Amino acid sequence: MKIILKYIISLKILLWACIAIYPQSYPFRSISVAEGLQDLIVNALYKDSLGYIWIGTASSLERFDGVHLKSFPIPEEGKRKDVNTIIEMPGHELWMGNRTGLWKVNGEKLLRVAADTIRSGVYSLCSDGKGTLYIGSESGLFIYNSKGVERILLDPNVLSGANFIMGM
């Protein structure tokens, strides 16, 4: 009798456990060219403090508000435009790095930043939360703040692969 009772209790516990781990159904919606996405190659995603989802594609930066897409085309003609990284700085400033350099979202358009200093692809961005932006690029680490842009080489040979920073 005790064995049967233990068996019944064990069976009930297993049934309750199965019900508890039953897969949840989450609403999922895909976004494609039909919804206004400029390119199907997505390299970077970022959710900002206002709730927008920023999508970095092979040809533009897109802002998704949950319903509509707003495209921010990259104005460089004939160049590889791949968006590699996106970050938000204090004050809701959105920055992105691509194969041509560093960009800032300025209202409804993209503004190239430090084009004379950062002339190579930007692959990673990191903020200290106080207004300093660390930029990992094909040609070293750059530090951007209110004083300007400073370049830091990890290897004195500018062509060295050690200066190619993909992530931080």
Regions found by a protein language model. Name each.
Residues 1-168:
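Carboxylate-rich, polar loop motifs that coordinate divalent cations or form catalytic acidic clusters
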